[in-house]
Amino acid sequence: MAEASVDLGTGDNLEQKILQVLSDAGSPVQIDQLLKKLQVPKKILNQVLYRLKKEGRVSSPAPATWSLGGDGASGDGAPEIPEDSAAQPSLEERILRFLETKGPQRALHIAKALGMTTAKEVNPILYSMRNKHLLTVSDTQMWTIYRSSQEGQERACSGVGQESPAVIYQQNPINMICQQGPNSLISISNSKAIQIGHGNVMSRQTICGDPGPGTPHHAPLPVLEDAAAQDTPPGTHGAQLIHLNKSMLRRVQLGHGNEMNLERDPVEHPIFSFSSSPPESTTTADPETAFNMQTPEPGPHPEGGTTQIVHIKSCLLEDTTVGNNNKMTIHRRSKGGTKESADSQELKEDTGASSEATPPRSCLHTPSDSTLLTSELTAMALGDGSPQITESMLREDEVQAAETCQTQD
């Protein structure tokens, strides 16, 4: 040990040993491993490491982690700056920029983007950023920015409250909708006239001419008005986790207290199929069906309570509301411009499915523990079956029938 102390005084022998250990490892090495192999005080080891980093001979891709070779940025790691303060802020900025560009990612993808090899190397900084409210992680281990990178850093420093989510305009056939908050990842494909959240209001009046035989009419997509963002304090309704896979969504509401007033196109939409087989009834026991919904009534909930969890797989949703106390009114307008009512036969023709595979219209309530699903859901309301709250989907000739059903409930 006396000889080792002499070598540390010069530093030459320690530098060679550090370079040899990093070269033999072939991947980033934690500071604890270096201390164990070199048997030197941590303070002296850090001094030599930062001197080598300044010379471009080693780099620090993560906090308390070192590798052989420079990082392409000379002079940014002065020895007098503590290790964590020098490496961690720079790495946080790189992670925030990566997620801001690429969207939600798994830890392994983030690690590879930073030049690392395993998720374990980046997990400590990810969870540290989550504790600072810079990042959030979903139940599927997808990491995303809590807000934007700049706003997230300002929030971590000043403790400013979370802003309401931005209004989302649907511009592509497949859209990624991310609510910037903890445990709120929503992924939806093939959406049209859709509302996500609580207390939304959508009203669209479409006057359809004669679009020609066999040509469906596609009106301009509406702008979503998030009334909950204005009237409801942040965090009142809690988190949402929604997965709708392989779903054709038309006029869909997700959340509580939404209201939608639309006019149905006179030309029937073509039947959409995700496979060559026709629609058929399925149950939650089938491997290709997934449904799980937990929707307490709107309002403050205990800490950790989840407001809405929806898993729907391989389902076509048309004129559908998911949540509590939603209201949807759909008017049918003929080619001549006059309104006409919709009946069960027209509803049946919309779906192209048998009466056995088509759920009843109007006051249909599916509880959260429902075991029956159809691969095509039309004019259907999904909720928690609460007797105090009614999910309604009304057509002009069904208002009276809906009121009767509500009384019976």
From Swiss-Prot:
Covalent cross-link (Glycyl lysine isopeptide (Lys-Gly) (interchain with G-Cter in ubiquitin)), residues: 17, 43
Any Pfam family matching the protein: RHIM
GO cellular component terms listed in the entry, alphabetical order: cytoplasm; cytosol; nucleus
Reported modifications of this chain: Ubiquitinated; polyubiquitinated following influenza A virus (IAV) infection.
Domain Z-binding: 8-70, 85-147
InterPro entries reported in the protein's UniProt record: RHIM, WH-like_DNA-bd_sf, WH_DNA-bd_sf, Z_dom, ZBP1
UniProt feature, compositional bias: Basic and acidic residues: 337-351
Sequence motif RIP homotypic interaction motif (RHIM) 2, location on chain: 241-265
Gene3D superfamilies: Winged helix-like DNA-binding domain superfamily/Winged helix DNA-binding domain
RIP homotypic interaction motif (RHIM) 1 (motif): residue ranges: 183-207
Regulation: ZBP1-dependent necroptosis is normally inhibited by RIPK1: RIPK1 inhibits the ZBP1-induced activation of RIPK3 via FADD-mediated recruitment of CASP8, which cleaves RIPK1 and limits TNF-induced necroptosis.
Keywords: Antiviral defense, Apoptosis, Cytoplasm, DNA-binding, Host-virus interaction, Immunity, Innate immunity, Isopeptide bond, Necrosis, Nucleus, Repeat, RNA-binding, Ubl conjugation
Record region (Disordered): 59-87, 269-307, 323-369
Domain of life: Eukaryota
Subcellular location: Cytoplasm; Nucleus
Role summary: Key innate sensor that recognizes and binds Z-RNA structures, which are produced by a number of viruses, such as herpesvirus, orthomyxovirus or flavivirus, and triggers different forms of cell death. ZBP1 acts as an essential mediator of pyroptosis, necroptosis and apoptosis (PANoptosis), an integral part of host defense against pathogens, by activating RIPK3, caspase-8 (CASP8), and the NLRP3 inflammasome.
Entry's free-text remark on domains: The Z-binding domains recognize and bind left-handed double-stranded Z-RNA structures, but not A-RNA, the right-handed double-stranded RNAs that are structurally very different from Z-RNAs. The second Z-binding domain (also named Zalpha2) acts as a molecular switch regulating pyroptosis, necroptosis and apoptosis (PANoptosis). The second Z-binding domain is essential for sensing influenza A virus (IAV) Z-RNAs.
Subunit structure: Homodimer. Interacts (via RIP homotypic interaction motif) with RIPK3; leading to RIPK3 activation and necroptosis; interaction is enhanced by CASP6. Interacts (via RIP homotypic interaction motif) with RIPK1. Component of the AIM2 PANoptosome complex, a multiprotein complex that drives inflammatory cell death (PANoptosis).
Name assigned to this protein: Z-DNA-binding protein 1
Species this chain originates from: Rattus norvegicus (Rat)
